[in-house]
């Protein structure tokens, strides 16, 4: 669920860091797309200029229309996708923290979003308004394993990161720890 969970100040404050888009898999795919798109773009340029710009092959033998042109367009589209991936990583979209403070009786859920008026996503509430901690499990092709906070007068607030689902034992452990800390029930098992 999180990169780290910290309970301090006499067990009255629970702080959970949530990993956003700065995951290894995102770095991996952004790098692969950048390298592949650069290769396609250089192959297209090489076929047009009849100068070899690649180390591994000789694209000067390609006919520019249609092969070189299409490779150049694929390369440009791939570089646009790679730029998007690197910007999402740089902005750490989805990253943030969950903070539960029993001293002040408040809950603060914070996430980074896309640039604009909703760049900082903050949800503040009181601990007394929490009804339960809910576990959602859906198996299949696109499995969902997530923790939600059920608060009076609001829809369920997701607490876990998006992406790779947590193991069932980790999900149950985190959910039980949070429900125990807040003094509410754990639903969905």
UniProtKB/Swiss-Prot annotation:
Disulphide-bonded residues: none
Keywords in alphabetical order: Membrane, Photosynthesis, Thylakoid, Transmembrane, Transmembrane helix
Please cite one Gene Ontology biological process associated with this protein: photosynthesis
Pfam families, alphabetically?
Ycf4
Q: Name one GO cellular component term.
A: plasma membrane-derived thylakoid membrane
Membrane topology designation: Multi-pass membrane protein
Q: What transmembrane ranges does the database entry give?
A: 29-49, 69-89
Q: Where in the cell is it found?
A: Cellular thylakoid membrane
Q: What is its main location?
A: membrane
What does the protein in this record do? Answer: Seems to be required for the assembly of the photosystem I complex.
Query: Which NCBIfam families does the record match to this protein?
Result: PRK02542.1 (NF002712)
Q: Which family does it belong to?
A: Belongs to the Ycf4 family.
Q: What is this protein called?
A: Photosystem I assembly protein Ycf4
Organism equals Nostoc punctiforme (strain ATCC 29133 / PCC 73102)
